[in-house]
């Protein structure tokens, strides 16, 4: 029986500055607090999963620099009991990092890709480990995986195909980018993805039109067409869309459902860094435990709820018992 989850892709040190306001260009704001923590898709997802279930077999895969920032990330990985056998260190590039400006419930990122830009398809293809899930994130931020590849279209598609041949279910996230980059880089990977978990802005790249109205409100009528577009592009099993108001999912049988978010007063939101990854972690854990799809979306929402109570990407993560209690209070059942 396959067991465990591999998290591969961007490993980043988030250097979070909590600011008192958002200044206009040329103006000044005050930094109220500073904190550093692991970031990037696989880091956030695995750290959240480790908090939910410390006994869950987790494996980190990616590239970091041979520097103090890399030492910090490795220490954080090991502290959580995550296996680091698939982590490589670069002598030429620094550990990827992001200066995160967080305030008033918003965030802005200044990113250095560093060693993540060196992560090559063959490094991940060599992982022959029989895990149940292989998570890869973020497409469009991994230079060599985003590069063209003659057989599969991109390096990422090649890696995902290899993981599926090995018997893993593939789970993918990507970042918001221009539609032309989506078509060139993400579309070739869709047929190699079992489960796609993205936000509404990223889904709009496939649909070719916004899923929000001009006043900023969500156009719910476009959620299903966006999910259907991604499924038609080749996603094998499940498309999950998340957005501040809630989440939606479309499975391969054509079943479509939505759930609202857990309500949280705006004044209690400390930061939104990693909220989407927290949602993904909740969904992945629920699917790993064979929970119904509706409960998976609800647990994703609960995971995001706790994420919003911390300035860092995984600092708000809690154990599954607490998540389940919150899920029942928010959604019933």
Where are these regions (language model features)?
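Ribokinase/PfkB-type carbohydrate-kinase core domain
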Residues: 1-13, 71-89, 93, 100-258, ...
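Glycine-rich phosphate/adenosyl-contacting loop at the front of the ribokinase-like
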Residues: 1-79, 268-272, 333
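Short, charged helix-to-loop "capping" segments that act as catalytic/coupling loops
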Residues: 38, 42-61, 140-151, 234-237, ...
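Short, charged, surface-exposed secondary-structure boundary motifs
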Residues: 39, 119-120, 206-208, 266-273
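Short glycine/serine/threonine-rich phosphate/pyrophosphate-binding segments
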Residues: 41-45, 95, 280
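Alpha-helix C-terminal capping segments
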Residues: 47-55, 101-102, 286-289
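Conserved post-catalytic alpha-helical subdomain immediately downstream of the catalytic base
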Residues: 233, 262-331
